[in-house]
Amino acid sequence: SIDQKLALIASRGNIKGLKGFCPVALRDSRLLVDARPEFSSSYKSMNYQFASLENKLKFDREPAKYAPAAGGSDIVTLVDKQDDQEGTLDFASWYKGRLYLFSSKTNMNVFMKTPALYVGVE
């Protein structure tokens, strides 16, 4: 359930970004699956870890499909304040197949009201 997923995300505390979950499992199945350090790749200066070799290879073929928008930075602070703040899965939204991470619930809500102002900023 959504409540169970939110509780699992919250249990990771103040960890930012994807909080140790596999981005491929998140994107393809909307599942929170633990990533493993032995399966990792870099994309746009960011390191990502995956639950399996299969997921790593999927990511390597199409990294832009699986990596969070703006490398996981809060796109609202990037656009509105030219400030690069790391987002977190605690405040996340799917929009047109891309995962957006935010540093606060307020910024997530701003994005959801007017996503066209922010989409495409990388």
Question: PLM ranges: what are they?
Answer:
Residues 1-122:
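Charged, low-complexity intrinsically disordered segments
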